[in-house]
C-alpha cells in the first residue's frame, strides 16, 4: 500500500503542468457566473445571493510576486533536500504545502497590498445571479455588462461604476410562467441580446433600448430542455447562432427559427466554442462541444451541417466537461489549435483538436470542498492578456502566462527519457441592436427598496497608485482540507513492467511509462445540483 501511494504521487507530478496561478480568490458564497473584461484586468463575479462584484487586478505585479516567491521556495526545498530533510524536490503545483501565488481568503475582504482591488459591489438581483457577460461591440467593447438573475430581470450596467442604465423583465415574454433564463449571449456586430431559457426557448432583445424595448425575435423550442450554451456565428451571419440544450445542437436564425438540429447524441451537451485558429481566420465552420461523459466532440458545418459529431476526443472518462473555451493565443500553432476544458473533478485540460488529444493538465482543485468533492470547474474565461481563468463555486484562479524555466527543463528531460517507449501511446485522449434610457427614467417608477439594493457601492482603492514593490507576501489558507489524488483520468487496467532507464550522472528512479501512470489512478465522480437557484 505504501508503494502504491508513492507511485500515485509520482503520477501526479508527471502529468500535472508546472504552470501555477498568480491569483486565487475564495468566495464565502457560491460563485455562479464569471466574466473577464476583453481589454482590461477586470473581473465580474455573480453570486448565488444576487450580489455582483467588480475586481481589478495588477497582473504584472502578481506575476512578479509569484515568480520571486516560487524561486525562493525552490531554493529552500533544494537546501532541505541536500540536508536530507526531504526525500525529493516536488514539482507539483496542487500538492505544494506552501503556495507561492497570492491568495484572497474572502472575496469581501481584499487586503490593501494584495495587487487586487474591489472597484464596486452591489445587490443586483433578488434571487441568484445566473449569468454575466461584457458588451462585445467593437465601438463600446467592455463598457457595459449584462446580468440576469432568477428574478427574471436582465440588467445593463456600466462596467466602470456598476450603475444600471437599462433593464427588462423577461418573464412577460415567457410562454410558460415557470420558465427562467439560463444563458445570455450578445452579438459582436449588432445590438441583439439573446437569452436562453430552461424550457429551451431563445428570446432576443435590443440591448441599446432595454428599458423601453419589446421582444425583438423569438425562437421557440430550440431544444426540449434548458439551453446550456449560445454561440454567435458572425462569420456566417449576424443573425445566426449555435445553441446547445439537452442532447442536441441547433443552428438557428433568430429571425426565422431553427435551420438544422442535430441527431440525439444520447449524452448531455454542456459547453461549446470555436477554436482560436478558426476565430482568427474568420471562420465558424468547426465547433468543439463538451459532453457529460467526459469527451470533446468535433462538429463541422461544411461536412454535415452540424447534424452529427465527426470526431471524439477522450478527456476524462469519469467527469463531465462543464466548460470549454479557446486559448485566444495565436502566437504559435500549438496554442491556436488548442482549447481549454474544465471538468467536474476540478481539473483543467488543454486539448489540441488537430492532434486529437490532451496536451496539458492543470489542477484547479484537488481537495475536498464545502459542497462535496473537489471544486468543479464550471466557469472558464480568458483575460485581456490570454491568461486562463478557472472557477468553481468556491474559488477563482488566474493562471500565469509564464512557465518556471527550471521546472520546464526538468519536465523536458523527463519527456525525452520516455519518448522512445511512449511516443505514440496516450489513452487519455484519442485521435480520431434607439438610445439608451437614462437612469432616472428607468429607476423612478420602481420601489425604493429595489433602488437601495441595486445601488453599487464604489470602493476607493486605486490600484494604479500602488507600487509593485509594496506588495506583501503570499497569504495562506487557514482551513485544513483533506487532499485527494489528482489527474485521475482513466480506469484501472493491467500494469506493465517498468522499463529500465539509462544511467545518468545523478541516480534517478526508474521512469514510469504513461500507461503505468494511468493504471495507478482511481475515479470518484458525482454531479451536484443546486435546485431553484
From Swiss-Prot:
Residues covered by region (Disordered): 408-533
Compartment(s) of residence: Nucleus, Nucleolus
Compositionally biased residues, Basic and acidic residues: 453-463, 521-533
UniProt KW Nucleus keyword: yes
Taxonomy, superkingdom: Eukaryota
Record carries keyword Nucleus: yes
Compositionally biased tracts (Acidic residues): 408-428, 437-452
GO biological process terms held by the UniProt record: positive regulation of transcription by RNA polymerase I; ribosomal large subunit biogenesis; rRNA processing
UniProt KW keywords: Nucleus, Repeat, WD repeat
Broad class of the protein's primary localization: nucleus
Transmembrane segments: none
InterPro entries: WD40/YVTN_repeat-like_dom_sf (IPR015943), WD40_repeat_dom_sf (IPR036322)
GO cellular component terms, A-Z: nucleolus
UniProt WD repeat ranges: 26-67, 84-130, 176-215, 264-309, 372-409
Family recorded in the similarity comment: Belongs to the WD repeat WDR55 family.
Protein name: WD repeat-containing protein JIP5
Natural source organism: Scheffersomyces stipitis (strain ATCC 58785 / CBS 6054 / NBRC 10063 / NRRL Y-11545) (Yeast)
Gene transcribed to yield this protein: JIP5
